[in-house]
């Protein structure tokens, strides 16, 4: 049963609802009155539903697409101002025990040279990134016993402690595997900016095909991670 407020993956992600939403959007891609109504709601910052968002994505009316783009810019500037915030990825380790079919880091890739950065190497990388002008990083690591939460936390401390040319990294975002409530608490206490977790698909059947083995193959555990965080 579809329940957007549920913390159970099988309830807040419903394949039937997703398919119906896509069909509804395609059926209304030329519905000018409906699309204008949705854009009016968006401009008033009243929020739109997932079905309404899908209709905007499918919109096939050029003039309304132009209105949509202009509105998106205005809303962005209203909320964030006239700026774009960028961050640089910092890969700590490509050791991984998962079998993601789209990723060269997958565990069965025996031709890849595996590497985990030492704290000294991390410090060197941070200095190089600062010299390029970066003040925000996204910490990346494969899922592997070597890349324990202790290693991640130590790496975060190292990054924040690098003082270079009277500057330092202001924000460390973290992109690591789905983990426990306790570990998310530790990340928050370490002062991270944003926790990032990619969900390649919400279709369970396709998810299992893309993730045939390893901890990430657990669809529910991965999909429910943001509720734990």
Feature map (PLM): residue ranges:
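Generic detection of intrinsically disordered/low-complexity segments and helix-coil linkers/edges
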Residues: 6, 18, 96-99, 201
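Canonical Radical SAM [4Fe-4S] cluster-binding loop centered on the CxxxCxxC motif
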Residues: 81, 85-121
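Core AdoMet radical
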Residues: 107-123, 128-229
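Flexible, acidic/Gly-rich N-terminal and inter-domain linker regions that tether
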Residues: 1-90
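Generic, ordered loop/turn and secondary-structure boundary motif
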Residues: 49, 76, 85, 91-97, ...
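Short, well-ordered coil loops that connect the C-terminus of an alpha-helix to the N-terminus
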Residues: 44, 81-82, 98, 165, ...
